[in-house]
Amino acid sequence: MRRRLPLFAAVALLAAWPAAAQPILTHLADGNDWKRSSIEQQRAYLAGVSNMISVGAAWDAKNLPGSEQTFSRTAQRGLKHTDLEEAVRVVDGWYRANPTQLNKPILSVVWREIAKPQFPPAK
């Protein structure tokens, strides 16, 4: 029995090894997802993004006190004057105006169409 346990453990590890070696594929929600979603789901998605940015900015403030140029802090500044309904309208309008770009992630649209225009152009 003692000889079988190490053999079983070795077989189990070898069986799991290929699964661990596979890359993790991440799907970022895009325009196709946006178009299929109800208004409530769209609001929930954007509220989740807002919460993620707020938590990230709070973490940055605590752990990186001198660094104002983190993604979360920058995004928070760029989005602070936009409410949820306006964000839904902007994202919805962008995908309506760009039907061939439904594969563009929603986060990219939020950044480029809402947050980034709040900053002066880079020199």
Please state what every model-predicted region is.
Residues 1-8:
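Bacterial N-terminal signal peptides that target proteins for export
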Residues 11-14:
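Single-pass transmembrane signal-anchor helices and their membrane-water interface zones
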Residues 16-18:
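N-terminal signal peptide c-region/cleavage motif recognized by signal peptidases
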Residues 22-47:
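Immediate post-signal-peptide N-terminus of mature secreted/exported proteins
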Residues 23-31, 55-123:
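Compact alpha-helical subdomains of small soluble proteins
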Residues 44-55, 112:
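Short, hydrophobic/amphipathic alpha-helical patches that form generic packing surfaces
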